[in-house]
Amino acid sequence: MEMKNLKITIDNSKKVSFNNNVDFCVGTGRMGLALQAEYLRQLDLVQKYIGFKHIRGHGLFCDDMAIYQKRTDQKTGEETIEYNYTYIDMVMDSYLERGLEPFLELGFMPYKMASGDQTIFYWKGNTTPPADYEEWKKLIQNLLRHLMSRYGSERVVTWPIEVWNEPNLPGFWYKADMEEYFKLFKESFYAVKAVDSRFRVGGPAVCGGTDEKWISAFMDFVSKEKIPVDFVTRHHYTTEFPDPVGHYGYAELQSDEAGFANLKTTRHIIDSHPEYKGLQIHITEFNTSYIPNCPLHDTNQNAAYIAKQLSRLGDGNESYSYWTFGDIFEEQGVPFTPFHGGFGLVANGCIPKPTFWTFAFFKSLKEKASICVHRDDFSVIVKTDDGEYRGVLFNRVNHRGDTGTVNLELSFPAVTESYSLITKRVDEETCNPLKLWHDMGEPANPSKAQIELLQMSAWPQLGSSLVSDGKVNISLPENAVVYLELKSCKLMSDRGYDFDKVMQYK
């Protein structure tokens, strides 16, 4: 296995394009799960170290949220429609208390409004069109008016709204009926705008496979109907079909270019309609694998691959929402173990996975006003307005031995006598709770003591040094992700204090 040695010279006169929207939105399991304590503990951890602005999930109108109620009077036989906001208020309160605004997904169908019995997932979300579109529109409008009354109109109208989820899959939308989805979109769009025209509404929220066909047809439809759609949404997953084994699905990663190609196609399709040229694209779901039981999600390989994604997803996309923040998630039922290949950044037991830190590192790049001074296949480096340098370095590989270790020699402009270098390292040797869990015997239900050890193993390795010449050397083993901060530093030793003498042990 060969090592790769690369030299990078930072030139402050160069401003490099880099749109870092890492914290705009994150995904969640269905909204009803937000009533669980462990769900909120995981969300607290994510918000403390990353701090997303929006959250998006399925199940807004599903029966466990109990918003839509249809009652029949036993004496008169008269039907009455009622709206119950008890649970949705609890969920929204929890989000807003944690600094999160919802990215509302309109779906799935309340059972008593549905035109059919088709459901999806362990929790049986109904995925058929409404039996009565007027009732569907009233449901949307009543909910929005309630939210505006409770949280304030000026706030709520800023919440993006997406119509449905992955209608190009027959499991998510009955027969993947494109014409019927377009009807749903149009009716929903104007129902929302009738409440307040400032709401921003988009779709079609499609996933890969038939995405090009659907997005092209969607843009033709809104153009023909003269619908002033506010943004386009799609999903982005980057593995091949999984190989099912027991409770798990093992999937191969796509190459970088294959993973990004369909996103470029989406941009081209939208811009081919002059009236919509430049329209925002929101990637409302992305991850490596699209299944919630892919062991890849728990690995350092996932963290490094996502680092490369985050370095480029802002090129042409307004936002990109990782699916999901945590592993309280029940699409295929309740998982058997803490490391079951769940989508989340956090494993059950509040154990940060390596990818958690990829997001935290990219968020650190934008904590201060800055410009990007370097971006390539292994790094993103920014300079803050107060003169610091911050960077995320990564060496992602698809297969063992693809690149070996990458040694980066970074040359920064030396304008002071010394710099203080701080690094945070995540790799398979230093921050790998999955390996510790394996070495414990892969307990399905770890004890409290085991969970504490797993949590301890899940933190980056901290490094520090004083740099006098502006040169920094960082070694990146396969699938490593390293965060660095470099800032000017002047030693202010107390009278008589000599650190070198202390370290001589004399």
Question: What residue ranges belong to the model's regions?
Answer:
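Mature N-terminal, pre-catalytic/accessory segment of carbohydrate-active enzymes
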Residues: 1-52, 478, 488-506
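Short, acidic/polar
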Residues: 12, 33-47, 212-222, 303-309
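Conserved, mostly hydrophobic/aromatic
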Residues: 25, 95, 143, 161, ...
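Glycoside hydrolase catalytic-domain groove-lining segments
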Residues: 42, 239-294, 318-327, 369
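Substrate-binding cleft and catalytic face of glycoside hydrolase catalytic domains
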Residues: 50-254, 291
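Aromatic/acidic polysaccharide-binding cleft in carbohydrate-active enzymes
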Residues: 283, 287-403
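Carbohydrate-binding surface patches
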Residues: 376-438, 478-493
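C-terminal beta-strand-rich structural cap/linker in extracellular carbohydrate-active enzymes
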Residues: 443-506
